[in-house]
């Protein structure tokens, strides 16, 4: 089946060229309200766009062998994660039991005796084990869970259980697009409210500019996310091909709203997601964070309490920007921060919090523990 987002590639470059010329003229005329294009930023966005096209093909081959119930190494992955979790739990217990105040930063502060020496030795071993084992348990569990979820919730797989066939007519097409839009709203919202999913999505928010090239700055690690499955549409009677069409329509719509060249659009702002609404979504201004998650329709945000108008000038990017245009850094910085936080944790509530709770919680927890903040913040 033809991927509409790939067919549109020539149009992407044509419209980016037109936008570049338009914003350049405005800036040369003294209008600093638009940021326009910057070479390294644009190249980074294009590189991430290419990566997002290649990643699904590569990940499918890489992850298939370790998918539980499907790959030869799936069982080994699960056993490794469970074993690492057991080691981590044991190390946590040792660290709690040996926390007697006779060490400061690993340096003895009391005279040695046999019992103290045994405790110190056990504590040193536990410290060496708890980080690597915790990371192995969490990473292995995430890979096992996400690969299993992805393979069991595809549109083609769920289509086998459908009870009706809505066909491919105009009503079915419109229905599929609207249903996809509704599911997209929740998936997009969850990507901002769970740090595990935010680590995937943060790529799209990492630019400090806002133009059509930003729309192409897409994640490459979707394979490690567990989302509300759009395959559910197949259970409702939408054919898998129609579900894919709905995906393409939604993604194409989102392309044109990544621009500063278009102002507010009157009454359309009440129903549709517009450039103005989506500029808010990309803002790091406190009142703009985690707002306007809709794809085509803004009504979901109005209904579920996440709507915000564009009232003041938007500051694009993250609350703490990564200061890098390197694609690898853009793609992995938040994952690296999560694993580092897990490695430095000594209890499961903290580990799970750093992975699954919101990005803001991680900042609060670091502050409570008087630790440095992660490299990149929320958007």
Describe each region flagged by the PLM.
Residues 10-25, 56, 60:
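Alpha-helical transmembrane segments of multi-pass membrane proteins
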Residues 313-379:
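Cytosolic-facing loops and C-terminal tails of multi-pass membrane proteins
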Residues 5-9, 46, 78, 170-175, ...:
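Hydrophobic alpha-helical transmembrane segments
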Residues 56, 87-88, 92-100, 104, ...:
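Membrane-embedded catalytic scaffold of the fatty acid hydroxylase/desaturase
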Residues 57-68, 135-168:
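Long, highly hydrophobic alpha-helical transmembrane signal-anchor segments
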Residues 13-17, 54, 79-92, 135-148:
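Hydrophobic core of alpha-helical transmembrane segments in multi-pass integral membrane proteins
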Residues 17-43:
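Membrane-interface helix-loop junction between the first two transmembrane segments
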Residues 37-56, 69-79, 119-139:
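Alpha-helical transmembrane segments in multi-pass membrane proteins
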